[in-house]
Amino acid sequence: MRVYLVGGAVRDRLLNFPVKERDWVVVGGTSEALLSLGYQQVGKDFPVFLHPQTHEEYALARTERKSGLGYTGFTCYAAPDVTLEDDLQRRDLTVNAIAQTPTGELVDPYHGVDDLNNRILRHVSDAFSEDPLRVLRVARFAARFAHLGFTIASETQALMSNMAINGELSVLTPERVWKETEKALASPSPQVFFQVLRDCGALAVLFPEIDNLFGVPAPEKWHPEIDTGIHTLMVLKVATELTDEVDSRFAALCHDLGKGLTPPEQWPHHYGHGPAGVKLVDQLCQRLRVPNSARDLAKLAAQYHDLVHTVTQLRPKTLLKLFDAVDAWRKPQRIEQLIIISEADARGRTGFENTPYPQGDCLRQAFKVASQVQVKNIVDSGLRGADIGHELRRQRQHALAQWKQQDDTAQDNTVT
């Protein structure tokens, strides 16, 4: 038996990335031989084993033949006569089809090292088109490695487009689509993921709510980039610079979905797009089975991002309504999340990328002031039942009114 390190571990080492997990392929071996050495079989559809000490995955070299629909319709053949080259040929991209011997020598029959050096994502063979999940995987790798200058080979792009046109993506389950999307949102350049999907036609199939934003104009005075789809990806890019949270990045992506519903005769204005967008966020999240935390934040972002932009003009009563609506008293982190999303919205415009966002500090301070009103003091005063809530709101509103008055006075004193 011969053992080789394969896949992402080899690729990431060559890119000087930290290797998080290692996968191995066993050539010339059998299930019986590995079991006799103490390996534990875990693969149901193909022979994958866990090493008895390291618990790393070891898979018998195998080939795959298309036998049905989708990414699960494959017949697997694993036997001692399957070569390393055979096994590597079934992989998606040449940069993922490089093997390494235990002594560190590279086995690279499909020129993955050249593609790594040239920053190219290229499919290994035409069998790529047999697995629709690979469209999402390539888009995700493009997002992960965009900051290094990686691009997709034109012939790979053409294959992806054909797969989208031919309806291949319709067999993807919601769970797999979201899993790849979630990984892409955690990458350094998630906006690239969605741009790649749009370029090959997959965005219209998998994320029609987002695809519908492209070609929808906004007022040039406020949006020099004009196109709402372009603005959306710009917002996602800024949000990625501001936070590592997948939920916040997803919410930034969804904040303007309602603009896709605006009748063309009303363009470039989008009155009421916030509430309209909430329904589309729900629709998208139900279809892809997005986790509740991401869904709930995205709905709040769609509903309230425009209100956050006007926070310096809001009355104390309106501020309290906002805090109540986003459940900030129980989930105070939502204030910071909404600030980040709203700042990304403001800066995700051509020419506004480095513009300060003072509304963030204003909302942050307002919530701090309102939060300093203690329920315990009200209870200790002898009030009971609903009177406690009424008094709590009154005191919070009073505290905000005093703060706004002091803030206005301070600003007046700075005027010369």
From Swiss-Prot:
Gene: cca
Sequence positions that bind ATP: G8, R11, R91, R137, R140
GO molecular function: ATP binding; CCA tRNA nucleotidyltransferase activity; cyclic-nucleotide phosphodiesterase activity; magnesium ion binding; phosphatase activity; tRNA binding
PANTHER family with a match to the protein in the record: MULTIFUNCTIONAL CCA PROTEIN (PTHR47545:SF1)
Residues reported in the UniProt entry to bind Mg(2+): E21, D23
SUPFAM superfamilies: Nucleotidyltransferase (SSF81301), Poly A polymerase C-terminal region-like (SSF81891)
Subunit architecture: Monomer. Can also form homodimers and oligomers.
Record remark: domains: Comprises two domains: an N-terminal domain containing the nucleotidyltransferase activity and a C-terminal HD domain associated with both phosphodiesterase and phosphatase activities.
Source species, domain of life: Bacteria
GO biological process, one term: tRNA 3'-terminal CCA addition
Entry annotated with the keyword Protease: no
Keyword Cell membrane: no
Species classification: Bacteria, Pseudomonadati, Pseudomonadota, Gammaproteobacteria, Enterobacterales
Entry protein name: Multifunctional CCA protein
Recorded catalytic activity of this chain's protein: a tRNA precursor + 2 CTP + ATP = a tRNA with a 3' CCA end + 3 diphosphate; a tRNA with a 3' CCA end + 2 CTP + ATP = a tRNA with a 3' CCACCA end + 3 diphosphate
Listed PROSITE patterns: HD
HD domain boundaries: 228-329
Keywords of the record: ATP-binding, Hydrolase, Magnesium, Metal-binding, Multifunctional enzyme, Nickel, Nucleotide-binding, Nucleotidyltransferase, RNA repair, RNA-binding, Transferase, tRNA processing
Family as reported in the entry's similarity comment: Belongs to the tRNA nucleotidyltransferase/poly(A) polymerase family. Bacterial CCA-adding enzyme type 1 subfamily.
Cofactor note: Magnesium is required for nucleotidyltransferase activity.
Cofactor(s) needed: Mg(2+); Ni(2+)
Further remark: A single active site specifically recognizes both ATP and CTP and is responsible for their addition.
Organism of origin: Photorhabdus laumondii subsp. laumondii (strain DSM 15139 / CIP 105565 / TT01) (Photorhabdus luminescens subsp. laumondii)
Coiled coil: none
Positions of transmembrane segments: none
InterPro entries: CCA_bact (IPR012006), HD/PDEase_dom (IPR003607), HD_domain (IPR006674), NT_sf (IPR043519), PolA_pol_head_dom (IPR002646), PolyA_RNA-bd (IPR032828), tRNA_CCA-adding_enzyme (IPR050124)
Protein task: Catalyzes the addition and repair of the essential 3'-terminal CCA sequence in tRNAs without using a nucleic acid template. Adds these three nucleotides in the order of C, C, and A to the tRNA nucleotide-73, using CTP and ATP as substrates and producing inorganic pyrophosphate. tRNA 3'-terminal CCA addition is required both for tRNA processing and repair. Also involved in tRNA surveillance by mediating tandem CCA addition to generate a CCACCA at the 3' terminus of unstable tRNAs. While stable tRNAs receive only 3'-terminal CCA, unstable tRNAs are marked with CCACCA and rapidly degraded.
